[in-house]
Design a protein with these regions (language model features):
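GNAT-family acyltransferases
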Residues: 1-120, 145, 179-190
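Secondary-structure transition/hinge residues
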Residues: 30-34, 129, 150
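A short, internal acetyl-CoA/4′-phosphopantetheine-binding micro-motif in the GNAT/acyltransferase core
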Residues: 95, 108, 120-131, 159
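Conserved acetyl-CoA-binding loop-helix of GNAT-fold acetyltransferases
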Residues: 122-125, 131-148, 166-171
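Conserved GNAT acetyl-CoA-binding A-motif
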Residues: 146-157
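Conserved active-site alpha-helix within GNAT-family acetyltransferase domains
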Residues: 160-178
């Protein structure tokens, strides 16, 4: 049986070994005009995490990138420090060997904003790794994480004009509920 790139891709914990390929992915997002997916050009944009701000320039420093990795990993703990509007989340990175391909995040609960706009799961595949099944494989893997954590049903949203993401969500069993504020909203029952 022929293996596809999505068969080789793995969901892994964020790790400093992805430093260079992570930065290259940020550059790809910027070059594609997708700064909202570049992730950390100025994160968090609303400056709501006192003492925590990552930029493309600051992440050139391996120590700062390790700080980012550590910060992301701490956000899995519901007791970790975060602004009131944020919820605990688990972020996994899509990788092939030491090559960063993208990320997928699972928010452990929904607040009002996430219920309308963000959903439980969000993902981004770097432009150079698209159209290879990575988003579908990552979503399938994260749905298993939802199952283990007892998150059911799962809300996933995408922009109304994001046809590839719509197909990915529907392919994972998403049932369309409605459109709110420019977002298609889908539920997956586990």
């Amino acid at each position: 049986m022929r293996r596809t790139p999505a068969d080789v891709m793995q969901l892994v914990d964020p790790h400093p070994r992805f430093h260079r390929s992570f930065l290259a992915s940020v550059d790809e997002f910027v070059a594609a005009g997708e700064t909202h997916h570049a992730g950390l050009l100025s994160w968090p944009a609303d400056r709501t995490f006192p003492g925590i701000e990552f930029t493309r320039t600051s992440l050139e420093d391996p120590a700062e990138f390790e700080h980012l990795v550590g910060f992301v990993l701490t956000q899995r703990d519901p007791a970790s420090s975060r602004p009131r509007a944020y919820v605990a989340y688990t972020e996994l990175w899509m990788a092939e060997g030491d090559e960063y391909l993208g990320r997928i995040s699972l928010r452990h609960e929904l607040n009002e904003l996430l219920y309308t706009w963000g959903g439980h799961i969000g993902y981004a595949v770097r432009p150079g790794a698209r159209r290879r099944g990575h988003a579908s494989a990552a979503l399938k893997g994260m749905i298993e994480v939802c199952r283990r954590m007892g998150i059911d049903p799962v809300l996933i949203t995408c922009d109304v004009d994001n046809e590839p993401s719509r197909r990915t969500i529907e392919g994972a069993g998403g049932t369309y509920e409605d459109t709110r504020e420019g977002k298609l909203r889908y539920w997956i029952d586990l």
